[in-house]
Swiss-Prot record:
A cellular-component GO term for this protein: extracellular region
Lineage of the organism: Bacteria, Bacillati, Actinomycetota, Actinomycetes, Mycobacteriales
Biological role stated in the UniProt entry: An exported protein. Unlike its M.tuberculosis counterpart has poor pore forming ability in artificial liposomes, does not undergo conformational change at acidic pH. Mutation of 2 residues to those found in M.tuberculosis (25-TA-26 to IH) alters the properties of this protein so that it inserts into liposomes at acidic pH, forming pores, like its M.tuberculosis counterpart.
Source superkingdom: Bacteria
Note: To improve over-expression in E.coli the proteins were cloned as a single protein in the (non-native) order esxA-esxB with a cleavable thrombin tag.
Recorded phenotype for the gene knockout or disruption: No secretion of EsxB, very little EsxB protein accumulates intracellularly.
Keyword Endoplasmic reticulum annotated: no
Complex formation: Forms a tight 1:1 complex with EsxB. An artificial EsxA-EsxB heterodimer interacts with EspA.
Protein's UniProt name: ESAT-6-like protein EsxA
Cystine pairs: none
Amino acid sequence: MTEQVWNFAGIEGGASEIHGAVSTTAGLLDEGKASLTTLASAWGGTGSEAYQAVQARWDSTSNELNLALQNLAQTISEAGQTMAQTEAGVTGMFA
């Protein structure tokens, strides 16, 4: 029988890395949007309207992705904490 070994610090570290990636990605998206907003302000007509529609879809999709990643990180963190509590409880039964 193989013994299960859990690296709780590693699990939490992985969740933190995902949170960090979300923050970095959000910052880069904001920076890119600021640059594009400057460019788009000089643009007029139907091309501008089409661009704004695509930009709105991009914004929505990138927000959904970041929310999904935040939820993933939170779920990983909570699962690690639950497993740590479970292991502590089981260990306590045999102490």
